[in-house]
Curated annotation (Swiss-Prot):
GO terms for molecular function: ATP binding; RNA binding; tyrosine-tRNA ligase activity. Its main location: cytoplasm. This is Tyrosine--tRNA ligase. Homodimer. It comes from Chromobacterium violaceum (strain ATCC 12472 / DSM 30191 / JCM 1249 / CCUG 213 / NBRC 12614 / NCIMB 9131 / NCTC 9757 / MK).
Length: 424
């Protein structure tokens, strides 16, 4: 891909919100292999799916021959970015942040290549801020920032203008830290481009200005739009919570199901944002879906692409196997690990003692019936199955033979209501 084609592709995908100087950036990318960076602050022990857009942007640039730097904010994570946040962040202890830094580093690494001429680099801004004292910070960095200009930034104004929440000097100083990151990475690695979400525009331009002042070097910024949904609800959240990249926090099955549930109004945009299918391929999928009778293919393709990208082929196959088994009512191909995923976050799950094996009690405990009386009615009407096999006896007790892998029984009422029993 030529460098002109790279920016054209990003624009066609809708992935460019703003640049500090598009023409000059285009010229730079055409002229040389550029080192670029994106920062990831450790605000939790895992990144969520909103972080995928910048991670994949680093990957897109690397595939085009440029060198990506993933900067984990071991120092900035101790402060907290106030950008468009309604309230002050909770400050976490250094040892907690250090653990989160390591987890995030391990999450980002698999997306990038650390071999070849444009091998990726992992960095941690604690390496330079940890050695800097307050006087150095105020003299060498602070003197280059105008408080007048900082106060005018939209993200700061939103906090200042709230009666219930102001902004501390700690968070107010955040943009100085992020700005210095750019200057430091420019000095250390020749970094000339910073990318980030559109909410980072103020911090990014602080960095381009500071780098020009400190290093007498022209550098650039590029932001991506924040991911939004057509219905106005928050992207990356479900009724059960945030969708994380860590498989221990969001199972690959739940992750796959999240993408399968994408609205028709969002699916093709998300394919452009989150997949490496070409814009033309995505347009063809959209066109075929318009004329297709029945369910569109876009959601399945999106779920497959992103699940494999994040969790790998084996995890995708497991998610597909679980999905097919539940749909077909045939559990014979499921593994113990598959059931563990369902118990983690795939289905409503209850823990029962093996001595409490009555089906009526289990239906009530699992929320498939409001009462034992209602449970009896459902059983008698043939609406209840255990592990895919219908049960019509009111005296039915769930025996050892129905405890798959000695631990799990899948209860179902009607066509779509499930409860997984995890026997203790």
């Amino acid at each position: 891909m030529t460098q002109t084609a790279l920016l054209q592709d990003l624009e066609a995908r809708g992935l460019i919100a703003q640049t500090t100087d598009m023409a000059a950036l285009q010229e730079l990318l055409n002229k040389e292999s550029v080192t670029l960076y994106c920062g990831f602050d450790p605000t939790a022990d895992s990144l969520h799916i909103g972080s995928l857009v910048p991670i994949l942007m680093l990957k897109r640039f690397q595939q085009a021959g440029h060198r990506p730097v993933a900067l984990v904010g071991g120092a900035t994570g101790m402060i907290g970015d106030p950008s468009f946040k309604a309230a002050e962040r909770k400050l976490n202890t250094p040892d907690v942040i250090e653990g989160w830094v390591e987890k995030i580093r391990k999450q980002v690494e698999p997306f990038l290549s650390f071999e070849g001429e444009n091998a990726a680099v992992m960095a941690n801004n604690y390496d330079w801020f940890g050695k800097m004292n307050a006087l150095e910070f105020l003299r060498d960095i602070g003197k280059h920032f105008s408080v007048n200009a900082m106060i005018k930034k939209e993200s700061v104004q939103q906090r200042i203008n709230r009666d219930d929440q102001g902004i501390s000097y700690t968070e107010f100083s955040y943009s100085l830290l992020q700005g210095y990151d750019f200057a430091e990475l420019n000095q250390r690695l020749g970094c000339k481009l910073q990318i980030g979400g559109s909410d980072q525009w103020g911090n990014i331009t602080a960095g381009t200005d500071l780098t020009r002042r400190l290093n007498q070097t022209q550098v650039y910024g590029l932001t991506m739009p924040l991911v939004t949904k057509a219905d106005g609800t928050k992207f990356g959240k479900t009724e059960s919570g945030t969708i994380w990249l860590d498989a221990k926090k969001t199972s690959p099955y739940a992750f796959y199901q999240f993408w399968l549930g994408t609205a028709d109004a969002d699916v093709y945009k998300f394919l452009r944002y989150f997949s490496f299918l070409s814009v033309d391929e995505i347009a063809s999928i959209e066109e075929a879906d318009k004329s297709r009778e029945g369910k569109p293919e876009g959601q399945r393709i999106l779920a497959e692409q992103v699940t494999e990208l994040v969790h790998g082929k084996a995890a995708l196959e497991a998610a597909q196997r679980i999905t097919h088994s539940l749909f077909s009512n045939d559990l014979t191909n499921l593994t113990a690990d598959d059931f563990a995923q369902l118990a983690q976050d795939g289905l409503p799950t209850i823990k029962l003692d093996k001595s409490a094996s009555g089906l009526i009690d289990a239906l009530a405990a699992g929320g498939l019936a409001k009462s034992k009386s209602e449970a009896r009615t459902f059983i008698q009407s043939g609406a209840v199955s255990v592990n895919g096999i219908k049960v019509d006896s009111l005296e039915h007790a769930i025996g050892d033979g129905e405890r798959l892998f000695g631990q799990y029984s899948l209860l179902k009422r009607g066509k779509k209501l499930y409860a997984l029993v995890d026997w203790q």
